[in-house]
A protein has these predicted regions:
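Catalytic cores of TIM-barrel enzymes
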Residues: 1-212
């Protein structure tokens, strides 16, 4: 290994190759409240700037978790502290107002194979790409200048299943109707790959994928 400091890209590539590095590659994420507090205390940047300040080795170009009904956010009821909404995946959940936290899952619109095939499947396949390809390419070019390891990011099939069907329907269907489960995962994967391909076609050449 060279005695000079490695770039983030070199560092991460050496990590995957099980070679020595000058330090452990690093990356971080922040709760929205963390950045908001820092900004009140004098921070003049957003979380992307903070990652650059901390010499993060990774740079995410885009996030792909395809909504089935893009833009849908229907407030069903609310009180002083929470609001219950129908989201872009057709689910109903109760969220805190003004702060982050795990929502209470109230219900899921896709609760049967019939609903999936009649409404959700065609809507998901027909929805336009929700990834901002221009922003992704801009981040790619900036990351290359900074020597960072670039990646496309998204969620794998099980998380998509839980988001669309809910845990109870999802787990029962794995036993009772596995072909339906395979189809949901296949459609989700197809749409995610389509969105990533759009970023590549726009000019980005990412180093890899980071899938949650």
């Amino acid at each position: 290994m060279s005695a000079t400091a490695l770039t983030g890209r070199e560092r991460v590539n050496r990590m995957f190759a099980r070679q020595d590095q000058d330090r452990v590659p690093r990356q971080d994420t922040f709760w929205p409240e963390t950045i908001a507090r820092w900004q009140k205390e004098g921070l003049q940047w957003d979380h992307h700037d903070v990652l650059r300040l901390l010499d993060a080795d990774f740079a995410v170009l885009c996030w792909s978790w395809p909504p089935i009904f893009p833009g849908q956010r229907e407030v069903l009821r609310q009180d002083a502290e929470t609001e219950t909404i129908r989201d872009a995946w057709g689910g109903i959940a109760r969220f805190w107002k003004g702060r982050s936290g795990t929502p209470e899952h109230v219900g899921f619109g896709c609760d049967s194979r019939e609903v999936w095939e009649k409404t959700y499947r065609p809507a998901m396949l027909a929805a336009p790409n929700q990834v901002d390809t221009k922003m992704a390419v801009s981040r790619y070019r900036e990351a290359r200048q900074l020597g960072q390891w670039t990646h496309l990011s998204g969620v794998e099939g099980f998380e998509a299943l839980r988001k669309i069907l809910g845990d109870e329907v999802c787990l029962m269907a794995m036993i009772e109707d596995p072909e339906w489960i395979r189809d949901v995962v296949a459609v989700h994967t197809e749409v995610v790959l389509r969105s990533w391909q759009a970023v590549i076609d726009a000019g980005a050449q990412p180093d890899g994928l980071w899938i949650y």
